UniProtKB/Swiss-Prot annotation:
The lineage of its organism: Eukaryota, Metazoa, Chordata, Craniata, Vertebrata. This is Transcriptional repressor CTCFL. Residues 160-170 have a biased composition (Acidic residues). A zinc finger (C2H2-type) spans 257-279, 285-307, 313-336, 342-364, 370-392, 398-421, 428-451, 458-480, 486-508, 514-537, 546-572. GO terms for biological process: establishment of protein localization to chromatin; genomic imprinting; transcription initiation-coupled chromatin remodeling. GO terms for molecular function: DNA-binding transcription activator activity, RNA polymerase II-specific; histone binding; RNA polymerase II cis-regulatory region sequence-specific DNA binding; sequence-specific DNA binding; zinc ion binding. It is found in: Cytoplasm; Nucleus. It comes from Mus musculus (Mouse). Interacts with histones, PRMT7 and SETD1A. Interacts (via N-terminus) with BAG6/BAT3. Its main location: cytoplasm. Belongs to the CTCF zinc-finger protein family.
Length: 636
């Protein structure tokens, strides 16, 4: 048979218990629950050695002195395979083409089986047959999932004639007749046209006893049909969608389950069920702390450990502990075993993690699936795209603990700390350009990026010159430093760098690619976005206003103050900023002059300006300029 068969060891006995039916008692029981259960008083034990591991019970006509035995055979087929393959046949000369209507059972997976029974008047009543099966053969937990139902297929009925009763040794296996055997069957018109009866068999554990099964036999309505449905077109109504495809189990090879969505195959049902949840959107397991849902209990347990701080997976080589086993395996590969199981088939690259190998493969294929939504940038992995998006938002999450300078990338901050604040950090000098680098790894990157010879010629952006070394190209392009090669086609604007021209062209196109994530404002330049974030969305921002000593007008930038003083007081000498590039305010300037000229009185003009500045500084917000008014003026 094409379906996988469940082996039944020879030597097991199946005990059939049946009691003579009393119509009165059966009618009372039928009114209660529709299923009569009869206590077994007499038993017949018969050993069946089946070649194909099928259970066969011989059928006889009910004689008063004989025990009544039902002819019953079950065929173990694939539980999830709705389309039947290779349905067996009985070698009986008289046959009729019949089909049964299978009722739909709610919540029960209908499994295919074949059942035939000799017709007799007692069949109008529902029978109950109790079969005792050893627990070693069918464990109770498996019996709860076994249900046998009738298939839509040709079923042959056994006659009351003992000569037509199938032999035990010859009919244990259901065989489909060959072409020459079909010719020996009598024509359909010659068969005795009478009402045939077919039964539905259900298998479930008996109440109170786990080692016995109750077979409930019910009637099914039958109809004659001209052409029997094909074996491969047989379907059971109400059956659920097929999940695992169970392959045929051969000798020496374990049974395997194959996924219908992807090529995944597993020999364990538990592993297969865990894989099936990957294709499902159901997340039934909910975290009671943050209400986050997960597909499996294992994922939920690992997530709860992050809340409680539990780290059950401990490294045996050090004192480190981790939440998941995957983190422990990755730690051991990086720190102890140095194993790199993922190797590239195109080069000598090897990686500890599969994700890094997938990212490396994209360097060969040129694929960049992660695209920036605000510019033409594309990356091979999501991390670099996230880092690039900070250039649009102006976010700088990394801060130097010494000088509080902020950076977009953590690597840039580490280089800054090593070069600016490292006291005993060794310095590495480049042998080609005398550049001093703090870390040896950064020196290797410097040599690879700037001083390695490229097979392709790199063209200068300003002239047709070409170079094979990036450092030589950079040095050459510096010769064009004072040349304004980039000119605007719509106005007379010219600049030295291409990026400045791109920023200028946004004035003509109206493009504002830099947006604030807090208030959804858009800006043409990144610097304007940075100033906006610092002014309006930084709670620790303290405005540093620069005061004009002549008109008491305040400015947030030193350059704006210098531009204003050229118009306001062209004869006055501009104050230069100090070494720290901090703006020199009017108060600082007066204090500095007082420090240099202690005991000398100020000139009348300076004294008047000083009193005027103090008066302006002491004004209340109702009579003077507030910070909010100044910011609004700056935006205008």
């Amino acid at each position: 048979m094409a379906a996988a068969e469940v082996p039944v060891p020879s030597g097991y006995f199946t005990q059939i218990k049946e009691q003579k039916l009393k119509p009165g008692d059966l009618e009372e029981e039928k009114e209660e629950d529709g299923v009569q259960r009869v206590e077994a008083q007499e038993g017949v034990v018969k050993e069946v050695e089946a070649e194909n591991s099928c259970l066969l019970l011989e059928a006889r006509a009910p004689v008063e002195s004989d025990r009544r035995i039902l002819t019953l055979q079950t065929v173990h087929l694939e539980s999830q395979d709705v389309h039947l393959q290779g349905l067996g046949w009985l070698s009986v000369p008289h046959s009729e083409e019949l089909s049964g209507t299978v009722p739909e059972a709610e919540g029960i997976l209908q499994l295919p089986s074949v059942l035939w029974l000799d017709p007799e008047p007692q069949l109008s009543l529902q029978h109950c047959v109790t079969v005792s099966i050893p627990e070693e053969l069918y464990p109770p937990e498996e019996l709860q999932r076994i249900h046998f139902h009738l298939l839509r297929e040709n079923v042959l009925m056994a006659e009351e004639n003992p000569e037509l009763t199938p032999d035990l040794d010859e009919s244990t296996a259901l065989k489909k007749p060959e072409e020459d055997e079909k010719d020996q069957l009598p024509p359909q018109g010659e068969t005795d046209k009478r009402e045939e009866r077919l039964l539905l068999l259900e298998m479930k554990p008996k109440e109170g006893k786990d080692d016995e099964i109750v077979l409930t036999i019910s009637h099914l309505s039958l109809e004659e049909q001209q052409d029997p449905p094909a074996a491969n077109q047989t379907s059971v109504p109400g059956a659920k969608a097929a999940k695992p495809k169970r392959r045929r189990q051969t000798k020496g090879k374990p049974q395997s389950f194959q996924c219908d969505t992807c090529p995944f195959t597993s020999s364990k049902l538990s592993t297969f069920n865990r894989h099936i949840k990957i294709h499902s959107n159901e997340r039934p397991h909910l975290c009671h702390l943050c209400l986050k849902a997960f597909r499996t209990v294992t994922l939920l347990r690992n997530h709860v450990n992050t809340h409680t701080g539990t780290r059950p997976h401990k490294c045996r080589d050090c004192d480190m502990a981790f939440v998941t086993s995957g983190e422990l395996v990755r730690h051991r590969r990086y720190k102890h075993t140095y194993e790199k199981p993922f190797k590239c088939s195109l080069c000598k690259y090897a990686s500890v993690e599969a994700s890094k190998m997938k990212r490396h493969i994209r360097s060969h294929t040129g694929e960049r699936p992660f695209q920036c939504c605000q510019c033409a940038y594309a990356s091979r992995d999501s991390y670099k795209l996230k880092r690039h998006m900070r250039t649009h938002s102006g976010e700088k999450p990394y801060e130097c603990p010494t000088c509080h300078v902020r950076f977009t990338q953590s690597g840039t901050m580490k280089i800054h700390i090593a070069q600016k604040h490292g006291e005993n950090v060794p310095k590495y000098e480049c042998p080609h350009c005398a550049t001093i680098i703090a870390r040896k790894s950064d020196l290797r990157v410097h040599l690879r990026n700037l001083h390695s010879q490229s097979p392709e010629e790199m063209k200068c952006r300003y002239c047709p010159a070409g170079f094979h070394e990036r450092y030589a190209l950079i040095q050459h392009q510096r010769t064009h430093k004072n040349e304004k090669k980039f000119k605007c086609k719509q106005c007379d604007y010219a600049c030295k760098q291409e990026r400045c021209l791109k920023a200028h062209m946004r004035m003509h196109t109206g493009e504002k690619p830099f947006s604030c994530l807090a208030c959804n404002k858009h800006f043409r330049q990144k610097q304007l976005l940075t100033v906006h974030l610092r002014k309006y969305h930084d709670p620790n921002f303290v405005p540093n206003l620069h005061l004009c000593l002549k008109c008491d007008k305040r400015f947030s930038r030193w350059s704006n103050l210098q531009r204003h003083r050229k118009k306001c007081d062209p004869e006055h000498e501009t104050l230069a900023p100090n070494k720290d590039r901090r703006p020199v305010t009017r108060t600082q300037a007066s204090e500095g002059e007082a420090g240099h000229k202690e005991g000398e009185p100020q000139c009348p003009g300076e004294q008047a300006l000083g009193h005027q500045g103090e008066a302006a500084g002491s004004q209340s917000p109702d009579h003077g300029l507030t910070c909010e008014i100044i910011f609004n003026m700056m935006d205008k």
